[in-house]
Amino acid sequence: MPSQMREAITRLNEEFGCRIFVISLGDKKRVFDGGKVGTWAATLDELARERNVVIIVSAGNRGPRAGSRVEQGVTEYPDYLLEANNRLLEPAGAMNVITVGSIAQGDGLDADMAGDVRVRPITRANEPSPFSRVGPGLGGGTKPDLVDVGGTLIFDPVVARLRGGEDRPSAGVLTLNHNYLNRLFTAGSGTSYSAPRVGFSAGQILARFPGASANLVRALLINSAEVPQQASERLQILGSEAVRSVCGHGLIDLERAGFSDDARVTLYTEDELPLDHFAVYRIPIPEVFQEGNTERTIRVTLAYDPPVRHTRNDYAGVGMSFRLVRGCEPNFIFEHYRKRAEVEGPFPEMENRFNCKLEPGPKVREKSSVQRASITFKRGIEQYGDSYYLVVRCESGWATHVDRQPFAVVVELLQKAEVRLYERLRQRVRA
């Protein structure tokens, strides 16, 4: 399969310019245990970097408790989602791809079944699908990256089994039928249906930004995502890491990914760094964003595509990270982060209050090739001035053959109050 995948993606990219690939396949014999990824995943990671393409992979499906006792699909949901046997299927653990899990569009009951007390739904709208496989990814990184609608299951005691969209369309996702001479449309349930929906969103981003790199597409999509409140509430009994392992960064908001609005501004850049170097980007902060007690959020998303090697324990050959600094002059920031010779002495210390406490912290986010974190203010921040600085660092690993690492960064400023943030920031940038 890896060689076939390489041949197919390379040919489609070279001959037809295809830049988005959706792979709704998985090896049921290769459940990712958090250790090394397989050769299939490594091949996709290599192709994403070599060809500058967006590869989207379904997380994989599993019947609740593998179908041993079907009624447990209802009574023990959502606990079984975190079982060891419900981890991602190869190649969904790949690092440079977008891995997609599934959420339900509703309870799956149609008009005929809604009044039958014997039929029991498992989910409500926007809760994790009972078949969706989960992370975390390599080294504890965030996987799946995103979720989208992929259907649900219902328990039908009349036939003593769980039923999905294949035979109860209300439980599934409407799609075209491959046997179109018999019937044009059909339905189904699975992450194989949620992955193409993310592919559509990626296509919309490329239509708006035709020259965007794969890194920028990933960064914009993941920056826009939010975990549905219904999913968070359903998973909270399973602990703090359950939401990240099941839903990743959440469900894409396509308008948010592609556009700014009056109270929300998205800035982005594409760049590359030599190994063991860093870059500092100024983020203008309008006065209206600094003042008052309204809730304001800065969200940062970094995406890069490191070289990988399947045979190594340290799979990625390059690492990247970021910090958000406020209240400091650029010269001080450069002095703080640059490498220093021994004769120069220690670097100048930076007070904690100047280093924005982004969540999740670096130990969690730096395990992934798409890193997202944010900070929310509920009081005035005038004392830190009208410029924040984003420090992006590139750290060498085993990939000594690599000179520079490409990446994309997205920074979003969001203010809940009714203010014309976009207009104020545009004036600052033009000035």
Curated annotation (Swiss-Prot):
Q: Which Gene3D superfamilies match?
A: Peptidase S8/S53 domain
Has UniProt tagged this entry with the keyword Oxidoreductase? no
Q: Among the record's GO biological process terms, what is one?
A: proteolysis
- For the keyword Mitochondrion, the answer is no
* Span of domain Peptidase S8: 1-258
Tell me which UniProt keywords the record has, alphabetically. Answer: Plasmid
Listed GO MF terms: serine-type endopeptidase activity
So what family is this one in?
Belongs to the peptidase S8 family.
In its UniProt entry, what is this protein called? Answer: Uncharacterized protein y4bN
